[in-house]
Amino acid sequence: MAPLNSQAAGEEESNYQCRFPRFMHLSWKRPYLTRVFDLAVIQKKQKKEMSDSEEKKCNDDSKQPVLVLDLLRSILERLSFVDFHRGRCISLEWYSASESCLAVKNPTSPWIILFPSENVESKNDSCKLYNPRDHSSYIVRDLGFDLARSRCLASSGSWFLMLDHRTDFHILNLFTRVRIPLPPLESTGDGNVFKRVYENVSDGSCIKIDNAVLWVDEKRRDYLVVWNISRLFGYHKKGDENYSWKVFKPLKKNDCCIDMAFKENKLYVLSVTRKVTVYDFSGGDSPVKCATFPSLRFRNGYSYNTQGCHYKVAVTLSGEVLIIVAKVEPYPRVECFFAVYKMDHNSSGYERISLGGEALLLDLGITVEANCMKNCIYFSNDQFHRYNGKSLCDDSNKNGICVYHIRSRYVVQVFEHLTASSKIAFKDARSFFPIFGGKWLL
């Protein structure tokens, strides 16, 4: 990584393009400590390129000074989020020092990821990340597959469940570039075969996986994927002997799933009857039904029209089950209505509530402790209009990434600037937490 000269620095107004092998292209102000970090990266690269004989002759590790952990921590704590996680990859010493900094460096507010629309002229394998805490944006390039013709179905930390334009699944970590292949959609294991009838579909939009959840435990190197089509549920765990999806059909013939969430080994399924059923995946091969919540019934005198509303399920920090009634009209300006209901165990009905000091991430189906955006809902228009083929840059969808305040009933933040000046057309946006809890080794 060549140092910037003064002329180049002046032309770029103290911003630069960081080019690290197979990593990120981003812009930020370059502090002195980043130069120290870059030097360490260069030294590692040079060391790797040396032959074994040259290394023994020119660089005896036992005679080289090793930075003490306190100094490494001091450097890591002053690096940007992306540089911090690049630094973890330099050596075992850097990785060990970073472990004590993870609680500081893991974000406490959700990031936003934007996925590209298909570009007919060239393959597009870039996506955009946005950190609202310091208003920094990153472009992730060279992911090694056609991202524009794939669709993100769910996320867990820094991991994303992707379905390509055929019927192939994989789990992707954007930061480490680890990809875990999953069984294809046809492999359901019990004769429920989905044929590859969408070979010429451009972006996977005709493969309508209704809902999906992803759970990844980096420390235990474990994962679970569950997807749903109508009444059919498919799931796959790490270590399953058969390379296929296990299937179960828990809903009645005239019922189907409209949303689901996952937390602490439990799958929360919201059906079209607005009933929530909970399935426990912590046991053996098959999930076990462990709880049922009655249908959401509106009491007399509710003050809004439910026609055209969407229904979502979520789980709070304390484990309470929520049903969210949502109505979003993106054009000509964002008009939203959200109502959050919680089960009232005393009356066996639902009561309308606020979130207090928590915030709701509809993409993840969970609430989190909120530092600033309290009693708010993070959502994107695409959640309610997926598979419509529209770009987030379209006039009818450009205000597609929003934060809604429950008490005031207004959209209090719109991230229009993420798409307004971009040369890339984005088809989807999601909130996620880029958490690094351990080193994933396959």
Swiss-Prot record:
Taxonomic superkingdom: Eukaryota
Signal peptide per UniProt: none
Database matches in InterPro entries: F-box_BR-signaling, KIB1-4_b-propeller
Gene Ontology BP annotations: brassinosteroid mediated signaling pathway; positive regulation of brassinosteroid mediated signaling pathway; ubiquitin-dependent protein catabolic process
Keywords assigned by UniProt, alphabetized: Brassinosteroid signaling pathway, Cytoplasm, Nucleus, Repeat, Ubl conjugation pathway
TM ranges: none
Protein's UniProt keywords contain Cytoplasm: yes
Pfam families recorded: Beta-prop_KIB1-4
Disruption phenotype: Abolished brassinosteroid (BR)-induced ASK7/BIN2/SK21 degradation, and BR-insensitivity. Suppression of the constitutive BR-response phenotype in the dominant mutant bzr1-1D, and accumulation of phosphorylated BZR1.
One GO cellular component term noted in the UniProt record for this chain: cytoplasm
Residue span(s) of domain F-box: 62-109
Motif Nuclear localization signal, chain ranges: 236-243
Location of the protein in the cell: Cytoplasm; Nucleus, Nucleolus; Nucleus
Subunit architecture: Interacts with ASK7/BIN2/SK21.
Function statement: Component of SCF(ASK-cullin-F-box) E3 ubiquitin ligase complexes, which may mediate the ubiquitination and subsequent proteasomal degradation of target proteins. Required for brassinosteroid (BR) signal transduction. Mediates ASK7/BIN2/SK21 inactivation both by competing with substrate binding (e.g. BZR1) and by promoting its ubiquitination and subsequent proteasomal degradation.
PANTHER family for the chain: F-BOX PROTEIN KIB2-RELATED (PTHR44259:SF15), OS07G0183000 PROTEIN-RELATED (PTHR44259)
Listed name of the protein: F-box protein KIB2
Native species: Arabidopsis thaliana
